[in-house]
Each structure stands twice: as structure tokens, then as C-alpha cells.
């Protein structure tokens, strides 16, 4: 926990709270949560003449705490500019205690810090298998955000090809994709965003003959089609399979979104 400089040892202090350490930490740093340091600094920092470098996530909290400690008689205390985020961006080494690798920690660090997600939630996302029926105006942004969030496997069902009139709203497709199957275009775009995602494509119509077989390996099904026949068909397949069904619809400036999960005690789309 001592960093050497040409004059004397420097003590590196990580003032983040415990739940923030899931994103990693600098090896050798002393963990001293800011919530305690502000009240009882001597518990972690008994010697006021030892040079201290404090860091938090962005550098803002550590800067304020450094000023506070100086006012309490600590002689040489500074804040690491940019905090742990800057350390990571600079490519310096850090350690993690979880099961995610450093690349995953960097990619998902902003959402892992959220209390509603944390590392446990991110692990669930990485293992999740989500099917999207329709790679159009609804399915494209859905696929984009699911991939960015780290959903491990995304299935895409669509039999159509990219047309010029699609591009203004179907954000996974580009002018160069005109004439290509939407499943191929969507897959390539998603992999550019997050190459870790496993993409399973079904270049076919979603019909009563294949519906149950297509959705069988997925945890959640998302409806992004443009017709009621497919919406009700996916609802029925999800009902029979006991899977959550996420419904979506949009016309002009109006939109609807709902989650149907009869197995969990709720209604289905036909109720």
C-alpha cells in the first residue's frame, strides 16, 4: 500500500464505498470508505505526516475529502485527478475480485455501480437469452440497447430485407445494407456495438408451425412486429411456454409497451 516516489513513500487510499469496488481497485491501495473517513479518519489514517493520495470513482469526492483532511492537520494529502475512471482509461493495471474480466468491468462499469444492478445483476444479463421478433422500428433499438447492456444471447426473427424507406427509423440498418436480410444487417450492427454478444438469427416468418420451436431456448420474448397476427401468435407461444412476453407497438407519435407473464400471476395479451 505504499507507492514509491523519489522523496518518500506515498500511501494510496481508496475512499470509495464497498459496493463500488466491484468495478475493480488499484492493487496495494488501502480501502478506507469515505463515509467513515469523514467521521473517524484516524481509524484508517493514524499518521498525519505520511503523504497520501486519495482516489474515488471520478476524483470529485476524493478532492473534497483531501481538502477536509488538510483542514484536520494532515500535512501532505492530494486527490488523484480523474479518479479510478481515469486510471482505467489510461490503461493501468487493476484488480477485480468478481468473475467478470477487466474488459467486461470497463464496458459495464457505469451500470454496475447502480444499486439495482451491481455485479449480480450484470451476471444475470450476461447469462440472459432474449428473443426479438421483428428487426424493424421496434426491434432495432431494442436490440441495440440490450446488446449495449450486456445481454449474453439475442435472437432475431425477421424474413424481410432492408429497404431505403426503413433506414430513417430502423437504427441497426444503414444505406449499405439495402437489399440484405434484416437479420444479417442487425447482427452485424450489434456485433459492432458489442462483439461479446451471441447473436442467433432466424431469417424466416414467425408462424404457428415454428413459433414454439423458435422461442424454446430463450428466457424472454420481445415482440417488435408490425401486425396484430404476429403479436397474438407470440403471446400464445409465450403463454404455452411459460415465458415472459414483452409487447410493443408504435403508430406515428403514439406507442405502447407492456409485460405479460401469466405464469407469474398476470394476464396475457388476449385477457
Task: Name what the model sees in each region.
Residues 14-16, 56, 134, 158:
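Short beta-strand/turn micro-motifs composed of small residues
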Residues 12-14, 79, 153-158:
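Short beta-strand "acidic-cap" motif of Rossmann-like dinucleotide-binding folds
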Residues 34, 39, 48, 71, ...:
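Adenine nucleotide-associated cytosolic modules
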Residues 1-11, 18-53, 57-123:
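Rhodanese-like catalytic fold shared by cysteine-dependent sulfurtransferases
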Residues 16-17, 226:
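Short glycine-/small-residue-rich Rossmann-like dinucleotide-binding loops
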Amino acid at each position: 500500500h505504499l507507492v514509491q516516489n523519489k522523496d518518500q513513500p506515498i500511501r494510496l487510499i481508496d475512499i470509495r464505498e464497498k459496493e463500488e469496488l466491484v468495478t475493480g481497485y488499484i492493487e496495494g491501495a488501502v480501502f478506507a470508505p469515505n463515509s467513515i473517513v469523514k467521521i473517524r479518519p484516524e481509524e484508517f489514517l493514524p499518521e498525519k505526516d505520511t503523504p497520501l493520495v486519495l482516489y474515488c470513482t471520478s476524483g470529485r469526492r476524493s478532492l473534497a475529502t483531501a481538502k477536509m483532511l488538510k483542514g484536520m492537520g494532515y500535512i501532505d494529502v492530494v486527490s488523484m485527478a480523474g479518479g479510478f475512471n481515469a486510471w482505467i482509461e489510461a490503461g493501468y493495471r487493476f484488480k477485480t475480485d468478481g468473475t467478470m474480466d477487466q474488459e467486461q468491468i470497463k464496458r459495464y462499469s457505469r451500470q454496475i455501480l447502480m444499486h439495482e444492478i451491481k455485479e449480480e445483476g450484470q451476471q444475470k444479463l450476461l447469462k440472459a437469452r432474449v428473443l426479438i421478433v421483428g428487426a424493424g422500428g421496434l426491434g432495432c433499438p431494442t436490440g441495440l440497447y440490450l446488446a449495449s447492456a450486456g445481454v449474453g444471447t439475442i435472437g432475431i426473427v425477421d424474413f424481410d430485407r432492408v429497404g431505403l424507406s426503413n433506414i430513417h427509423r430502423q437504427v441497426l440498418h444503414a444505406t449499405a445494407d439495402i437489399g440484405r436480410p434484416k437479420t444479417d444487417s442487425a447482427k452485424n450492427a450489434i456485433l459492432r456495438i458489442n462483439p461479446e454478444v451471441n447473436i442467433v438469427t432466424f431469417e424466416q416468418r414467425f408462424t404457428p408451425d415454428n413459433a414454439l420451436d423458435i422461442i424454446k431456448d430463450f428466457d424472454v420474448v420481445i415482440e417488435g412486429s408490425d401486425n396484430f397476427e404476429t403479436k397474438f401468435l407470440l403471446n400464445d407461444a409465450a403463454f404455452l411456454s411459460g415465458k415472459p412476453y414483452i409487447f410493443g407497438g408504435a403508430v406515428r407519435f403514439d406507442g405502447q409497451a407492456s409485460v405479460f407473464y401469466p405464469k407469474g400471476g398476470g394476464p396475457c395479451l388476449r385477457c
